[in-house]
Amino acid sequence: SADGRYVSFDAPYTNLVTPATSGTQVFRKDLATGEVLLASSNVAGAQGNGTSASSSMSDDARYVAFHSAATNLVSPASSGMQVFRKELAAPYYFYFAEGYTGSGFQEYLCLGNASAASLTVKATYLYKDGTTKEETYNIPGNSRATVNVNLAAGADKEVSIKCESASPFIAERSMYFNYQGRWTGGHDAVGATSPSISWFFAEGYTGAGFDEYICVLNPGDLPANLTFRFQTQEEGEKTVPGFSVPAHSRASFKANQLLEDKSYQTSLKLESDHPVVAERPMYFSYSGTGGYGWTGGSCVMGAPILASSYYFAEGTTRAGFEEWLTIQNPGAADISVHAVYYLKEGAPVEKDYPVPAGRRSTILVNSGDGVGTEKDVSVLLTCTSPFLAERPMYFDYRGLGNWGWTGGHCVIGAASPASEWFFAEGYTGANFEEWLCIQNPGAAAATVTITYYPEGGGTPIVRTHAVGGNTRYTVPVNVDAGSNLAISAKVSSTVPVIVERPMYFNFQGKWTGGHDVVGYVP
């Protein structure tokens, strides 16, 4: 597949799937979860009764094409050697490990539908005691829907969510909070499309003023045994085994406690003997370089696999913002990561950063190690070896109204550019400011079309923007789409780009903060 996660192949082995196969068949393997599916089968799941080989796969791994002499794959029966296409990834799924509806927390589920036809999404709420609850939501064509999870899942619940539909959609989960009555803010995540036996996180801090958690959802039928491998900047790898999450359940683990309440700048590789989903919420009072006391929170969905490149469309080192890069090297050899900073004006700036084996490195982009202050910047990080990178940012956001909203947000970079990006969440009402940050890493100029889908349906709002080559471009959505809108968005480009959606807010006039996500690519 395009992201390197899936591989298709033919093999004569009998023990790759259950029930056992015979003869040469075509399979697809998920390298993140280890799951193997039989592609050379009919609609009832029966294996082909003849030799199947010469497979190829679509970029998203949804379709596998192959030659086969089997006569029972379609109806009416075929004869001789024929070409077949098998669809393997239906329905569509999004998973969320984090979720809490207790005092001081408000959780929402945003469901976006960028097609003209209506669709139905089934949401399964999974609680820490192993019980579940199912709800069904109808999403009109060219629209989005917002679910109040506090009402749907019930009050005072630690809850994960599994969303599924027979049609393409996108799901995000936004949360707003007054954490322990001390720190206000919000965070947001795009759901994971499948569980995995490994999850990577580049960012993490257990020092003063920071509370870090790892939330784990086990949607499977067997208990999941976990091993936490923290790659600390200070002391290398620290392994913490011996934890488990029951089937159809979720659990939260405080990283500060797992690391004996010591102060570490740390990355994490989470390992499980059965596929799970993992997120990392963090809550903080950020002192930074100036003793600021900016309170807030952030949350990222982990990465199931590593990559050799990461793109970050958003970034600024202007007054009131501090931007960092955290780089994880879980491998056994030292690596060097090359950074290209794309500025709003001027030539790109290039730097190189060493990352020792089994550790993580941290770069303050505002400093001379990055690009310095008063810059709007996108970043490309590359390495010859697989690694992971995140970009935490902390702020006293002034925005369009000189607000003074403090908080932070964090994302894992996009592994590659794309021609289409989707966002389920978006709001331009009072006390919310939404932006789209577009990074064009190529030399050719891009014509970017943004289609906004209002909640409840209606005519989509379409806007077009020109984005020059090797530049970063920012769209103020409150101006571009208009005010007082709950919207999803599709961003299409004539050349591949990267898109993020930062949002800043004063939720209900009492909880200030911000959150950001990299868009979803089908």
Regions found by a protein language model. Give the residues of each.
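Conserved "turn/edge" positions that cap or connect secondary-structure elements
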Residues: 1-89
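Gly/Pro-rich, tryptophan- and cysteine-flecked surface segments typical
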Residues: 89-522
